[in-house]
């Protein structure tokens, strides 16, 4: 009992004790003693049970028990302790101990256990007494066990089946324990029936154990799949498919990853479960109901899961369309808003001359052209808005029922929902919806199965607002153009003014026109470069862009003369009139124009090169895809293998030609790669020089990679199909040739039926011909088997070909976006089915012909015997009847008895023949099934248990190799993807940022807030600069009074420098700065020492001055203040201090930047799940690079070890082949080939093996019995054939002599020799088993030591890098893997223990074989006794003849005839029995041929002559080591894959703009905090210095006269004022930092706004026009007075409730959107303005938001 005070149910046991007072100390001691006694009882129970189990094992082995007295004494001691425990527990309960009830309950359970233990003790040790005098009614016990077993059923759920397995294991052990007792009951005749019943019981128990094991395994795997499917379905039902979910891209990636990688494997597992269930049902498994229920559940859940996959795909498409539409509309609105702001700001006519207005008019013309083109975009968005699905309704119940459409079929409790049908949504409950069908029936179904069809009111409103915005912009552009034209006409009529100014303005206008033209062309170039190519027409789009670039080139050629003329005129004007007012501006414009033109030429050249390269790349990609599509579509047309041989040849030639064509066209891939590299180079040049990134590069790289994969897949597809065709052709030719030959032979077989007119010679001729024909038919059986093997090969080849075709079709459907149920077309019938039918028909025909001819042979033999016996019968009738002695009558009676026995046996054989024929017809109707051809070979084979273990290890090893291969392929793919991402990161780091800016739009409110924060941050920066200038000025003034600079900041800097080890270049620069800093510090220290010396001297002089007169003091002070050297010294120190401060600020900035990078890296490493990453281009950590290099070296080493392990495995396999080839070479090869190629279910194999062994045993027993019976019959016949002797003899003495049969004696001797030999073999096997177990235990210990050492090494290695959190997590995972490996080793140990149990079971089987031999010996003894009895009867007959001395014995003719007839009947019955036995054997062979017609042939060696364990055991150990090598390499590959996946996920999600903004704000916040800390430190330092200066000033003020006091007072006042300003500045900084932190927190938290909003606006109807006016407009129009205006304004409101979920939980505020104020509900509750009852009324919607807002705001 581990703990006495664990929680239990309260018991009712409470013994009566005397109540007495007891202290707390005594109570605690009582509880302690009670705990000790209970532990002692628990220990006694455990010890007693262990010793009783050991004694029970000894009793079962027939030995005496050892621990009878010890166990009895411990039981008595436990009972005594229980009495004490009950009394102590009663006392504790009486004293109201808190755990008194639990203590009493535990003691009650202990008492029950001790009572059960005593009963078990009596039961066990009573067996020892019964062994001496056995009185058990074994027959009743066996009957009881058999009845109990027959009444057992199979559970319907997994826990019940597990319980049944445990119960039956106990039951089976009990059944096995009965066997030795039955074997000890002697050789009584009545015991044979009991043994037969026991064997039946044992067989039934073993069968139930196997059935339970198979059912448990099948139900466990079905339960695992059902749990996975349930979790997947629940995840999809609970997923948010509404507009609120913005994480749909990751869901799309997850969905595509599962579809491409895991769906096929999962479907194979589901299909495997169905096939295994069908096999169990076909084998008539007794747990049929449970298997069918689990099969139906898996099928239903898998069907539901496929339907949910269809729904998920549809929802992802709707979400993408929804969000893409909103992003496009937002972009369009931003563009139109920008155009509108440009029209307002840029195109105003005020303060512009004629030339500027002329330039603006030209720009407006271009703007109108752009707007005309943009009209198509707006109309397209309006059309798309009509197709957008209203996702918002998925998260809220609409005001009225709306129609929904079903995406899949779903069977609910209320009814069936059909795909494509429309229903009405009544209520939205989140995960499930309440619906109503067309008939008015209410249904409840998951929301994921439905979609709300278009249109979306919000999308329509957005599209309409976009259209109205577009029209307003067009109108404003037209109005601006009219205004500018009017202003232009006015300016044309005005006086031009000064000629030089007019000329300058003209030149400026010309340059502005050229510049605007250049800007327009640059925009056109960037407009060509920035948008990605259209997916469907990339080649045409790139060609059109090339044409556009040519047009831009022509435009530049047109602009060049004008640019040259304008710049030349401008330069001439500048030289002619350098003093003019427009000359500086004109010079700047000329330089800008020339620079812009050169920039534009370079950009145009690179753009043309990039577009040309992209065009070539897209063309090559298109050609390659078209070529692949041609071949793939051609291959996709073939569903199966052609039937005729000629078409097979043509198809093979066609595939060979296609393979050659693919090899010849492989150069296209090289061309594509070259074009891709050229595109990368052009894109990198554009990105580095002009910051123009290529948006198509990532897609093009993916296309090239995908093209290479598709090309390789197509080439492999062609190769595999060609191999399958070649194999199918060869197999089909062999099959067809053999089939036609055998069929022709079977058809042309002659018929030798007996006729009534046939003579004896004709009958003999027919019989001879029939025997020859039957031998010839039997010789053709091998040919039929070969034909079946060829058929199987052909079917397998066709199946492989069809599998490749199905793979290609699935791949093309997935690539083309077709669904499986859409793309399925009519399939041709497989020729394998036809060949299979022909094979079955041929086998049936052969079996039928063989049976018919066998029957004909029997008929001929029977007719021939009748013809031969006919003359004897006639002679017998003509013989005279004479008397015969009594011995002839007795002999006739015996023969008649034998005749009856033979007749009964013949009847049994006929019934068996009929049952076999019925089974043959059943098999014919059912189709061919699996069969096993059994060959008996006398050879040494391994132990079957070890062989099975060896096969299991081989399968495990193959699975591990397959998994490692898959992981290796996945690792290579991830490495390729990682290298591609790293290359993109190195080539163009800003590419993803630009892309995200174009595609990802942050929340509008968040964007506004970020902009506001940016503006405030800029203001803070400007204010910080001003404050820093003030601080520097203050430092200059106070520097003269500073005594020593605080070293704390330097120490902090040094500490941070130690940590900055990420960038070697920065580290080197920082080391250089540190050295310079140290030199400056040394110089500063020297100067400070000089300053301190001068200050000490100054103090000393001041003290001396204090002792002198006032005038002298004044003069001395003036001299000290005006000392030029000191002033120079102070100014030098001030300058040095400023330099030091500047350097410190620079180093602080560097430190801050490095810290920011470190934090960014740490955040990136820590954020594994969160998808918000910062796109920062940083240099990697050198240690991380070295660690990566080490890991790569380790990976290479592990790959080398993996290859070594594979080579070693191959060598082991070759050794295994050599071991299997021992003995007859041909047989070993055939067996090895067949066993490796085909593998059946191990449980079915065990059952077949057991049945084969039983058949062999029965067959051998029957053969031996038949042989002995035949010998006895020969002896009987010999005795009958001996003629009676006439003897005249006088008997003097009667002597009875019994002699043993020599043959029987020899047989007994041989059996005894065999028995001794088997006993020796058993001893050798036991000795070998003990040695093998010792070797296994030793190997397990060695393996465990090796694995523990590996774990320790890995832990030490991983702990060497404590700075990397990701590495540490990887190390923790590796430790978990090693722990799981230890668990696997423990499981392996348990498996070996089970194998030991299996060996013990084999020994028991050997014991049963010995019993069978003993029974055979007893049967031989019985036959010997019978033979002796027959001899005795013969002797008695002779003695009887002897007593009648002179009587002449003659045969009675009548008796002689009867005797002859009986003998003929006996021989005839024997002959018929032999014929029936032959026919039965023939039918059995036919049955075996029919059973093997469908599946592969297996050659099973069933006779184990000598069990050898050593080589196989070593082989198992070697395979275990190789398996561990494979597992270790798999774990290492898993670690590498997980690391690469983590890094890949970091690179993929590294481009989030919102995360970048937040991190930027965090960095700014951190900088401000650092500045705040620095300012606080500087403030404290300056305050201390000012305090010192103030002290000195007070001293000086006390010592100096009035004229000097004024100067000191003014200086002190200025210092105090500066100190106050600095304190105020610090407080302001603190407030600003807190405000920024609050805003940052508000940006960081996730907002969830409750849809509770009230807005009331009041309008006034104009009485004349009817137009709606606001109160303000009505007041301005004079419709209402001021008081009415104030009253109406007060009635307007715009309240909104906002619920914010932040780090501190959820909080709600009332937002007055009209005034911008926010009122917290929590504060109102705390202050009492709002009561909880009122708030509950609001929550229950009994109070409006307006009333709540009035209460919260306090506006009562």
Swiss-Prot record:
Subcellular locations according to the entry: Cell junction, Desmosome; Cytoplasm, Cytoskeleton; Cell membrane; Cytoplasm
Supply the alphabetized keyword list: Cell junction, Cell membrane, Coiled coil, Cytoplasm, Cytoskeleton, Keratinization, Membrane, Phosphoprotein, Repeat, SH3 domain
Q: Name one GO molecular function term.
A: cadherin binding
Tissues showing expression: Expressed in stratified squamous epithelia and in some other epithelia.
Q: Which residues carry this modification: Phosphoserine?
A: 14, 465, 887, 949, 1584, 1657
* GO annotations of cellular component type: cornified envelope; cytoplasm; cytoskeleton; cytosol; desmosome; extracellular exosome; membrane; plasma membrane
Coiled-coil zones: 16-125, 188-389, 585-820, 886-1645
Give the protein's recorded name: Periplakin
- Functional description taken from the UniProt entry: Component of the cornified envelope of keratinocytes. May link the cornified envelope to desmosomes and intermediate filaments. May act as a localization signal in PKB/AKT-mediated signaling.
Spectrin repeat positions in this chain?
Answer: 216-317, 323-485, 505-612, 733-861
**Organism of origin:** Homo sapiens
Keyword set includes Cytoplasm: yes
Q: Note whether Repeat occurs among the keywords.
A: yes
In this protein, which residues make up the domain named SH3? 399-455
Q: What is its main location?
A: other
Q: Where are the Plectin repeats?
A: 1651-1685, 1700-1735
Name the protein family: Belongs to the plakin or cytolinker family.
Assembly state and interactors? Homodimer or a heterodimer with EVPL. Found in a complex composed of PPL (via C-terminal linker domain), BFSP1 and BFSP2 in the retinal lens. Within the complex interacts (via C-terminal linker domain) with BFSP2. Interacts with VIM. Binds to the PH domain of AKT1. Interacts with FCGR1A. May interact with PPHLN1.
């Amino acid at each position: 009992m581990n703990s006495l005070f664990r929680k239990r149910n309260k018991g009712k046991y409470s013994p009566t004790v005397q109540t007495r007072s007891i202290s707390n100390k005594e109570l605690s001691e009582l509880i302690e003693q009670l705990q000790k006694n209970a532990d002692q009882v628990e220990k006694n129970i455990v010890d007693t049970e262990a010793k009783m189990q050991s004694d029970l094992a000894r009793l079962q082995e027939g030995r005496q028990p050892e621990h009878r007295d010890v166990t009895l004494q411990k039981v008595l001691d436990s009972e005594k302790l229980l009495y004490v425990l009950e009394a102590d527990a009663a006392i504790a309960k009486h004293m109201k101990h808190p755990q008194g009830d639990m203590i009493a309950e535990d003691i009650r359970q202990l008492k029950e256990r001790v009572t059960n233990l005593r009963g078990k003790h009596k039961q066990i040790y009573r067996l020892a007494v019964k062994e001496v005098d056995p009185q058990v009614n074994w027959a009743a016990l066996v009957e009881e066990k058999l009845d109990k077993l027959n009444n057992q059923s199979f559970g319907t759920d997994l826990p019940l089946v597990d319980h049944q397995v445990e119960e039956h294991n106990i039951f089976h052990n009990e059944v096995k324990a009965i066997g030795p007792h039955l074997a000890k009951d002697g050789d009584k005749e009545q015991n044979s029936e009991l043994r037969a019943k026991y064997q039946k019981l044992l067989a039934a128990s073993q069968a139930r154990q196997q059935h339970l094991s198979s059912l448990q395994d099948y139900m466990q795997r079905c339960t695992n799949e059902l749990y996975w499917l349930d979790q997947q379905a629940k995840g999809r039902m609970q997923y948010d498919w509404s507009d609120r979910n913005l994480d749909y891209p990751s869901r799309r990636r997850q969905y595509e990853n599962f579809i491409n990688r895991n769906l096929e494997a999962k479907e194979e597992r589901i299909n495997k479960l169905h096939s295994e269930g069908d096999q169990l049902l076909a084998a008539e498994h007794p747990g049929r109901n449970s298997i069918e229920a689990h099969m139906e559940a898996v099928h239903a859940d898998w069907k539901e899961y496929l339907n949910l996959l269809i729904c998920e795909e549809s929802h992802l498409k709707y979400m993408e369309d929804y969000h893409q539409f909103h992003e496009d509309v937002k972009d369009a609105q931003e563009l139109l808003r920008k155009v509108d702001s440009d029209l307002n700001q840029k195109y105003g006519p005020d303060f512009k001359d004629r030339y500027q207005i002329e330039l603006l008019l030209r720009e407006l013309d271009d703007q109108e052209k752009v707007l005309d083109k943009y009209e198509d975009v707006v109309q397209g968005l309006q059309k798309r808005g009509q197709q957008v699905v209203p996702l918002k309704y998925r998260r809220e119940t609409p005001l009225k029922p709306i129609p929904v459409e079903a995406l899949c079929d779903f069977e609910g409790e209320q009814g069936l929902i059909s795909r494509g049908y429309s229903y009405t949504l009544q209520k939205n409950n989140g995960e499930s919806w309440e619906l109503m069908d067309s008939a008015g029936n209410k249904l409840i179904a998951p929301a994921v199965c439905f979609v709300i069809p278009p249109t979306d009111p919000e999308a329509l409103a957005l599209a309409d607002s976009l259209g109205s915005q577009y029209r307003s912009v067009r109108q404003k552009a037209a109005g601006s153009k009219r205004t500018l034209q009017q202003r232009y006409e006015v300016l044309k009529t005005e006086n031009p003014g000064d000629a030089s100014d007019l000329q300058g303005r003209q030149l400026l206008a010309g340059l502005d026109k050229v510049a605007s033209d250049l800007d327009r062309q640059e925009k056109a170039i960037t407009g060509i470069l920035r948008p990605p190519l259209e997916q469907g027409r990339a080649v045409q789009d790139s060609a059109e862009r090339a044409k556009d670039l040519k047009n831009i080139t022509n435009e530049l050629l047109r602009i060049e003369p004008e640019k040259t003329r304008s710049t030349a005129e401008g330069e001439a004007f500048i030289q002619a009139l350098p003093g003019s007012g427009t000359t500086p501006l004109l010079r700047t414009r000329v330089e800008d124009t020339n620079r812009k033109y050169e920039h534009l030429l370079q950009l145009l050249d690179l753009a043309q090169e990039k577009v040309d390269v992209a065009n070539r790349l897209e063309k090559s990609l298109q050609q390659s895809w078209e070529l692949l599509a041609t071949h793939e579509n051609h291959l996709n047309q073939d569903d199966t293998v052609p039937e005729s041989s000629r078409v097979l040849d043509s198809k093979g030639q066609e595939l060979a030609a296609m393979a050659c064509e693919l090899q010849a066209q492989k150069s296209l891939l090289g061309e594509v790669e070259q074009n891709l590299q050229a595109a990368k180079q052009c894109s990198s040049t554009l990105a580095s020089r002009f910051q123009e990134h290529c948006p198509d590069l990532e897609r093009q790289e993916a296309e090239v990679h995908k093209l290479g994969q598709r090309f390789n897949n197509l080439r492999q597809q062609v190769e595999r199909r060609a191999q399958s065709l070649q194999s199918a052709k060869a197999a089909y030719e062999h099959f067809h040739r053999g089939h036609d030959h055998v069929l022709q032979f079977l058809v042309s077989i002659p018929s030798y039926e007996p006729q009534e007119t046939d003579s004896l010679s004709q009958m003999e001729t027919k019989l001879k011909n029939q025997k020859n024909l039957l031998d010839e038919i039997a010789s053709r059986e091998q040919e039929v088997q070969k034909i079946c093997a060829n058929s199987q090969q052909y079917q397998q080849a066709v199946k492989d070909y069809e599998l490749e075709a199905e793979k290609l079709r699935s791949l093309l459907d997935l690539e083309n976006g077709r669904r499986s149920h859409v793309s399925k077309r009519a399939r041709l019938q497989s020729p394998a089915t036809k060949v299979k039918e022909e094979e079955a028909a041929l086998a049936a025909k052969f079996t039928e012909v063989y049976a018919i001819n066998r029957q004909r042979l029997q008929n001929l033999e029977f007719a021939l015997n009748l013809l031969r016996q006919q003359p004897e019968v006639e002679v017998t009738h003509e013989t005279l009847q004479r008397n015969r002695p009594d011995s002839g009558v007795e002999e006739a009676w015996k023969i008649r008895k034998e005749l009856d026995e033979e007749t009964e046996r013949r009847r049994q054989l006929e019934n068996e023949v009929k049952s076999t024929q019925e089974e043959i017809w059943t098999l014919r109707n059912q189709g061919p099934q699996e069969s096993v051809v059994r060959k008996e070979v006398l050879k040494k084979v391994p132990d079957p248990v070890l062989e099975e273990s060896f096969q299991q290890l081989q399968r495990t090893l193959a699975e591990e190799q397959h998994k490692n291969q898959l992981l290796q392929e996945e690792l290579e793919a991830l490495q390729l993807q990682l290298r591609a991402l790293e290359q993109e990161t190195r080539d163009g780091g800003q590419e993803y940022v630009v892309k995200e800016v174009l595609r990802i739009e942050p929340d509008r409110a968040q964007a506004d807030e970020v902009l506001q924060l940016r503006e405030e941050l800029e203001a803070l920066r400007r204010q910080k600069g001003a404050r820093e200038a003030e601080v520097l000025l203050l430092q200059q003034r106070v520097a003269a009074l500073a005594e020593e600079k605080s070293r704390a900041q330097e120490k902090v800097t040094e500490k941070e420098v130690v940590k900055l080890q990420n960038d070697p270049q920065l580290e080197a620069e920082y080391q250089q700065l540190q050295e310079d800093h140290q030199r400056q510090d040394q110089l500063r220290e020297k100067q400070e020492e000089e300053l301190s010396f001068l200050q000490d001297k100054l103090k000393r002089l001041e003290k001396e001055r204090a002792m002198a007169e006032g005038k002298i003091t004044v003069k001395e002070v003036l001299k000290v203040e005006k000392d030029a050297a000191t002033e120079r010294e102070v100014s030098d120190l001030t300058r040095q201090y400023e330099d030091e401060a500047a350097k410190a600020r620079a180093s602080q900035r560097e430190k801050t930047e490095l810290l920011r990078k470190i934090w960014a890296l740490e955040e990136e490493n820590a954020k594994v799940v969160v998808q918000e990453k910062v796109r920062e281009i940083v240099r990697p950590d050198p240690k991380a690079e070295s660690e990566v290099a080490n890991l790569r070296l380790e990976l290479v080493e592990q790959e080398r070890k993996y290859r070594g392990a594979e080579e070693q495995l191959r060598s082991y396999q070759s050794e295994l082949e050599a071991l299997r080839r021992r003995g007859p070479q041909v047989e070993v090869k055939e067996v090895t080939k067949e066993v490796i190629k085909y593998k059946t279910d191990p449980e079915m194999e065990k059952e077949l093996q057991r049945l084969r062994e039983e058949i062999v045993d029965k067959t051998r027993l029957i053969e031996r019995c038949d042989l002995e019976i035949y010998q006895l019959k020969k002896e009987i016949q010999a005795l009958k054939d001996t003629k009676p002797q006439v003897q005249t003899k006088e008997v003097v003495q009667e002597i009875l002599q019994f002699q043993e049969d020599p043959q029987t004696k020899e047989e007994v001797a041989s059996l005894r020799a065999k028995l001794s030999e088997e006993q020796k073999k058993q001893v050798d096997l036991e000795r070998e088993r003990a040695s093998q177990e010792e070797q296994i235990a030793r190997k397990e210990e060695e393996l465990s030591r090796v694995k523990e050492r590996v774990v320790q090494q890995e832990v030490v290695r991983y702990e060497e890098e404590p700075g990397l959190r990701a590495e540490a997590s990887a190390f923790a995972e590796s430790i978990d893997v090693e722990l799981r490996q230890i668990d696997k080793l423990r499981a392996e140990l348990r498996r070996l223990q089970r194998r030991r149990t299996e060996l013990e079971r084999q020994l028991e089987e050997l014991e049963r074989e010995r019993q069978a031999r003993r029974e055979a010996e007893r049967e031989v003894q019985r036959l010997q006794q019978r033979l002796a009895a027959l001899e005795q009867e013969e002797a008695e007959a002779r003695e009887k003849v002897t007593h009648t001395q002179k009587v002449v014995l003659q045969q009675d003719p009548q008796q002689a005839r009867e005797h002859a007839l009986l003998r003929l009947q006996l021989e005839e019955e024997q002959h018929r029995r032999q014929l029936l036995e032959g026919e039965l054997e023939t039918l059995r062979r036919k049955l075996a041929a029919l059973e093997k017609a469908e599946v592969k042939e297996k050659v099973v060696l069933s006779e184990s002559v000598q069990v050898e364990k050593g080589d196989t055991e070593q082989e198992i150990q070697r395979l275990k080591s190789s398996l561990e090598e494979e597992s270790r390499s798999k774990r290492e590959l898993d670690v590498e894959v997980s690391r690469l996946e983590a890094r890949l996920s970091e690179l993929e999600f590294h481009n989030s703009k919102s995360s970048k903004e937040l991190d930027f704000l965090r960095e700014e916040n951190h900088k401000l905090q650092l500045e705040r800390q620095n300012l606080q430190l500087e403030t404290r330092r300056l305050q201390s210095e000012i305090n010192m200066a103030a002290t000195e000033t007070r001293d000086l003020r006390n010592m100096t006269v009035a004229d000097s006091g004024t100067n000191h007072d003014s200086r002190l006042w200025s210092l105090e004022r500066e100190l106050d300003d600095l304190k105020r500045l610090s407080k302001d900084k603190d407030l600003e930092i807190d405000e920024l932190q609050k805003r940052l927190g508000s940006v960081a938290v996730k907002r969830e706004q409750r849809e509770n909003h009230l807005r009331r606006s009041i309008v006034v109807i104009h009485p004349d026009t009817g137009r709606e006016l606001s109160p303000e407009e009505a007041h301005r129009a004079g419709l209402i007075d001021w008081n009415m205006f104030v009253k109406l304004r007060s009635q307007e409101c715009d309240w909104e409730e906002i619920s914010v979920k932040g780090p501190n939980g959820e909080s709600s505020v009332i937002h007055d959107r009209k005034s911008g104020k926010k009122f917290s509900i929590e504060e109102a509750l705390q202050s009492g303005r709002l009561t909880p009852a009122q708030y509950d009324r609001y929550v229950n919607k009994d109070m409006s938001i307006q009333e709540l807002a009035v209460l919260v705001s306090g506006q009562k």
